[in-house]
Amino acid sequence: MLRAQDIDASRPLTTEEKSFDVRTRKQLFDLIVAAQKSAFGADYELADPERELEPNAAIIFELEKAPYCLNYGLQFTLKPGTARYNKVQGELATFMQKAATLKSPEEAAAMNETMNPIDYLNLGINIYVNDDAHIEFISFRRNPQKITKPGARYVVRGEGVTATALYFGHFGPLREEDDTTPGSKAFAATPKFNPKTSRLAVQSILLVITAPHDIVDALYSKMNLAALQSMIAP
């Protein structure tokens, strides 16, 4: 299968393609920011508000009726001066003091498998639109949730940080891929494109949220899943 990374995207985008990019970006940006504010109030802020979901890659498949693929990244940081920020800083100071007393690599490894307060300082979201997305879930050592079928929320819980994948649209079976990181796994989700649908249409969305368990759960609880699903073409 031809993948986004195999394509030469050097040619300029057409007006229609730019319009699709802008429209899709705004819809996703508004939905995610609304969920973040509803879950955390003013505790988190955009790390780079000028970018507002600027695409990392805008790839045009050169195959007839194939879709326009977009990859976006959105990063929030914990706002200094908030109660949540001060709490994390206090916990981080305690964590670092404890780390300084460790006497062996084994002790350090065991401590690294606990919650590190520094994980709360950032909330990262990767967004894949119409993309043959290859997602590596590292820290997949304990209690991995079995991934069965696309179309729902899948949670991969490591020690401390959760990678949560939200799939919307038309996907084929998830497949496990080789991963060189000891104790970890990698999965990929391949969209199933409908040739009867307009090339410039959202046929699949995959969100990958990386943050501590409780942060991911709070954000997910406020996500307008119906609005995300409504972006998908029939």
Q: Which role does the model predict for each range below?
A:
Residues A4-Q5:
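Boundary of Sec targeting at the N-terminus
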Residues P12-F193:
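Short, solvent-exposed recognition patches
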Residues I205-P234:
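Surface-exposed amphipathic alpha-helical segments
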Residues T197:
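Short, surface-exposed charged micro-motifs
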